[in-house]
């Protein structure tokens, strides 16, 4: 019953107030970026994802918020495009495979190199450690330390440990993005 009332309130609010936000999703290949987009768009997880070639754009509506998501390929040849797609967005979402400890250093370096770009100064960053359902996956505290997130001082930064497969913490991730979008516009 409460869910029905909540949906009705969201629908009623959407008649008078719509919010749009744009974000860019980046991270090394095989971290789960496209899977994340599919899970928030449709609630569906698929094991059969293929790597993104270049970029994909998808619009997802949650309540009265429409999120335009740029999903950028993570292979080395596409990383030079990251900055271009991150300019002017409401938030940058940086995805990490939290279970692949061998790639953490490369992931940290790519994140810090990206955020050092003057054109991206001040854009908030949401760091997501995906695949928390796998053995030996780093938790939030370990991600913050290994990714040296405390060194990032010029912007809002948040970190969550998620699992697209199990849909763990997907809701809190969306809440952060939507809340941040609302607070940035007020």
From Swiss-Prot:
SMART domains: ARF (SM00177), RAB (SM00175), SAR (SM00178). The keyword Hydrolase applies. Keywords: Cell cycle, Cell division, Cell projection, Chromosome partition, Cytoplasm, Cytoskeleton, Endosome, GTP-binding, Hydrolase, Isopeptide bond, Lysosome, Membrane, Mitosis, Nucleotide-binding, Protein transport, Synapse, Transport, Ubl conjugation. There is a cross-link at residue 141 (Glycyl lysine isopeptide (Lys-Gly) (interchain with G-Cter in ubiquitin)). It catalyses: GTP + H2O = GDP + phosphate + H(+). Its EC number is 3.6.5.2. It is found in: Late endosome membrane; Lysosome membrane; Cytoplasm, Cytoskeleton, Spindle; Cell projection, Axon. PROSITE patterns: ARF. GO terms for cellular component: axon cytoplasm; cytolytic granule membrane; cytosol; early endosome membrane; late endosome membrane; lysosome; spindle; synapse. One of its GO terms (biological process) is anterograde axonal transport. GTP binds at residues 29-35, 71-75, 130-133. GO terms for molecular function: G protein activity; GTP binding. Ubiquitinated at Lys-141 by RNF167, leading to its degradation. InterPro entries: Arl8a/8b, P-loop_NTPase, Small_GTP-bd, Small_GTPase_ARF/SAR. Pfam families: Arf. Residues 1-19 dip into the membrane without crossing it. Interacts with tubulin. Interacts with BORCS5; recruits ARL8B to lysosomes. Interacts with VPS41; the interaction mediates the recruitment of the HOPS complex to lysosomes. Interacts (GTP-bound form) with PLEKHM2 (via RUN domain); the interaction is required to recruit the motor protein kinesin-1 on lysosomes. Interacts (GTP-bound form) with PLEKHM1 (via RUN domain); the interaction is required for PLEKHM1 localization to lysosomes and for ARL8B function in delivery and degradation of endocytic and autophagic cargo in lysosomes. PLEKHM1 and PLEKHM2 compete for interaction with ARL8B. Belongs to the small GTPase superfamily. Arf family. Small GTPase which cycles between active GTP-bound and inactive GDP-bound states. In its active state, binds to a variety of effector proteins playing a key role in the regulation of lysosomal positioning which is important for nutrient sensing, natural killer cell-mediated cytotoxicity and antigen presentation. Along with its effectors, orchestrates lysosomal transport and fusion. Localizes specifically to lysosomal membranes and mediates anterograde lysosomal motility by recruiting PLEKHM2, which in turn recruits the motor protein kinesin-1 on lysosomes. This is ADP-ribosylation factor-like protein 8B. The lineage of its organism: Eukaryota, Metazoa, Chordata, Craniata, Vertebrata. The gene is ARL8B.
